[in-house]
Amino acid sequence: MTVADRTRLDNFDATRAKAIAEARAEGAPADVATLDKVLAGDLLPLHSYKFDGDWRCRTIKIGGMAPKLVVYGWFKCRFHEDGAGLWLDKTTGSQRTRGLFYDDGETRMIYLGKSHYSYEKPGLYGDDPTRDQVAYAYRVGPKRARIEFPAPQYESLLDIIELERE
């Protein structure tokens, strides 16, 4: 993990709190209600859960820009495991991500990924620092998870990918 990404994670709580406060203060009421739903739910254990398979996913951009809250439509994501560990691929939409998860306690994982456009071949974290992504991932329901990206490279203070198993 790069020093810059370690710093993003070290500042996660403050970044997250500021982004959510901005979104709640200035976001459209329907979008704030969606955000509150996404943030709801107890953090559940990860170790015995099987993420493999197809999920629907959407990105929510929070704070830092105008508007302060943007909720995008649903796309498709896929989790799979191999010898390296658990992977996520966002498989539809113009902006995508691919990355690997690492254990970080009973209820949280660290995601190290790389953003790419639909017309590009997916790469790996570390290939291009301007495309590197770092996040914390949580399971928040029997068929729900979210990945929170503090201080992403562009636009917002916090990005969340909301995931629901299909």
Stretches found by the model and what they are:
Residues 1-50:
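Amphipathic/hydrophobic helical signal segments and adjacent flexible N-terminal regions
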Residues 32-37, 126-137, 142-166:
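Edge beta-strand at a domain terminus
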Residues 46-109:
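Mid-length scaffold segments of soluble, non-membrane domains
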Residues 64-75, 110-136:
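An anionic, turn-rich surface loop/hairpin at beta-sheet edges
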Residues 84-90, 119, 141-146, 166:
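Short C-terminal domain-edge/linker segments immediately following a structured domain
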Residues 91-98, 114-119, 149-156:
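Short, solvent-exposed aromatic-acidic interface loops
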Residues 96-104, 120-126, 156-162:
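A short, polar/proline- and glycine-enriched secondary-structure boundary/capping micro-motif
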